[in-house]
Structures are given as C-alpha cells and as structure tokens.
C-alpha cells in the first residue's frame, strides 16, 4: 500500500497524469463493498473517478484486446485502452502477466523511480 500512496501523492503533485481503465472503478467497488460496505465503496469509487481520468472501454478497445497476445483478457483490455489513448505506459503490480503487452509496463516501484523526487 505504500507504493499506492506514493503514486497517489505523485499524481497530486502533477508528476504524471493518471488514468484507470473503465473496469477499475467496478473492481474497486466490488472489493471495497465486500470489506467495508456499500457506502464506503461508493465513496471510494467517487474519489477515484473524480480524481483520475478514466479510459473508456468500448467496442474498438474490446476488439483490439483480442489481438494482443496476452493470457488474461482483462489485462489485454487495459493495455488496449491505454494504447487507444496513446498513453506512455501501464503501471501494475502484476507485471508478469503483461509480458506480451504492446506498451511499456512498470511495477509501481519501477515507475516511482522514474519520477522527480521533489
């Protein structure tokens, strides 16, 4: 969680522009609701979508993801969404599943190392 907090702070300092895939708020809601309840889950989603940009998941992205030779379709969708918006990279704790991604992929720690320190 320290890396997530560091990424959030770096985004607040405008060291980078942060995007999440359209599926991310849904996943956050599901996980937080199970742990903390529906009200906290809605607050978490509201904070996420009001603070970060959201990559739209449309038919073009879903089709493009099928052409990416990745095992996990959801991961491929995230890559396709990032590519469609011409983003520079994907940041994920699960870098091993992104070996065939068509865009650079960084772990949170590796991405943080590339950012300014002030």
Q: Where do the model's predicted regions map?
A:
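Short, flexible helix/strand-to-coil boundary loops that buttress conserved ligand/catalytic motifs
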Residues: 32, 69, 102
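Extended, non-globular alpha-helical segments
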Residues: 45-51
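Active-site neighborhoods of divalent-metal-dependent phosphate/nucleic-acid chemistry enzymes
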Residues: 53-95
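Short amphipathic alpha-helical segments and helix-helix/interface helices
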Residues: 5-9, 45, 78-79
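Acidic, PIN/NYN-like endoribonuclease modules and their adjacent C-terminal/linker elements
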Residues: 6, 51, 83-118
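Short, well-structured N-terminal submotif of metal-dependent ribonuclease cores
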Residues: 1-20, 33-40, 100, 112, ...
């Amino acid at each position: 969680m320290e890396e997530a907090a560091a990424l959030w702070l770096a985004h607040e300092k405008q060291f980078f522009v942060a995007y999440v895939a359209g599926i991310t708020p849904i996943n956050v809601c599901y996980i937080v609701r199970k742990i903390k309840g529906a009200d906290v889950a809605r607050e978490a989603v509201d904070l996420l979508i009001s603070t970060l940009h959201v990559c739209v998941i449309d038919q073009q992205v879903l089709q493009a993801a099928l052409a990416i030779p990745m095992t996990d379709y959801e991961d491929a969708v995230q890559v396709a969404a990032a590519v469609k918006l011409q983003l520079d990279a994907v940041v994920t704790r699960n870098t091993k599943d992104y070996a065939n991604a068509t865009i650079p992929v960084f772990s949170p720690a590796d991405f943080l190392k590339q950012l300014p320190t002030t």
